[in-house]
Each structure stands twice: as structure tokens, then as C-alpha cells.
């Protein structure tokens, strides 16, 4: 089986459907004997340029190891799902399991906010 990186963008009005879509797509990969190495829901983000007069979209990143048949099925599903604005599927040489730069930056911000809140709480006690 080959390794793939999949990114798809969902219409912002359909953001509540994203967890169901992720579950469906990961389920089809696992049913075929594949593996999900990384799954990141980046949430609603600003687009670099408008697509269908939209300025935001809900982004999802998946790194999977799957047979070609599953990837073909996912491509077809993306093509006929009106909620999916854009998608890209790239074959990679190795499984990518580390967090993406987007996820790392998000985690660093959470840690920084937690430290600031802790410092403010300690200052208030004194």
C-alpha cells in the first residue's frame, strides 16, 4: 500500500457536516485495510483567493496508507460532493505522523495563552 496526503476544503456553511465526512472517509480507508497516520481538522480558515464568491473554507488534512482503489473512491466522492470546494491527493514516499506546522503553531499558541493566564492568576493572588 502507498502513502498519501489528502487535503480537502469544505464549504463554510457545511462545517457541521465535517465530523461525519471525516468519519466516512476514514472508515472507508480502514475497511480496505488501510491506516490513518495523521488526521488534523484545521477548522475554518481564510482563503488566499475567493472560490465561488466564498472567502473562507473548512480545511481537513489526512495522511493515510491505503490501496489505490480507496483513493480512487475518495476522489470520486470529493468530485460529486457539492460541499467539497477543493481537494488535493498527493502520493508520498513515507508515512507522515508528526504534526503539521499549522497544528504546531496552534499548540504553541495554546501553551502561551495558558502561561499568560497562569501568570495573571498568580499576580492576582499576591
UniProtKB/Swiss-Prot annotation:
> Does the entry feature the keyword Oxidoreductase, yes or no?
no
The residue range of the signal peptide is none
Q: Keyword rRNA-binding on this protein?
A: yes
Species per Swiss-Prot/TrEMBL record: Actinobacillus succinogenes (strain ATCC 55618 / DSM 22257 / CCUG 43843 / 130Z)
Q: Which Pfam families match?
A: Ribosomal_S6
* GO MF, any single term: small ribosomal subunit rRNA binding
Its gene name is rpsF
Q: Which HAMAP family does this UniProt record tie to the protein?
A: Ribosomal_bS6
A cellular component term from Gene Ontology for this protein is: cytosolic small ribosomal subunit
Family per UniProt? Belongs to the bacterial ribosomal protein bS6 family.
What is the designated name of this protein?
Answer: Small ribosomal subunit protein bS6
Q: A GO BP term, please?
A: translation
**InterPro entries in the cross-refs:** Ribosomal_bS6 (IPR000529), Ribosomal_bS6_CS (IPR020815), Ribosomal_bS6_sf (IPR035980), Ribosomal_S6_plastid/chlpt (IPR020814), Transl_elong_EF1B/ribsomal_bS6 (IPR014717)
Known SUPFAM superfamilies for this protein?
A: Ribosomal protein S6
What keywords appear on the UniProt entry?
Ribonucleoprotein, Ribosomal protein, RNA-binding, rRNA-binding
| Entry function | Binds together with bS18 to 16S ribosomal RNA.
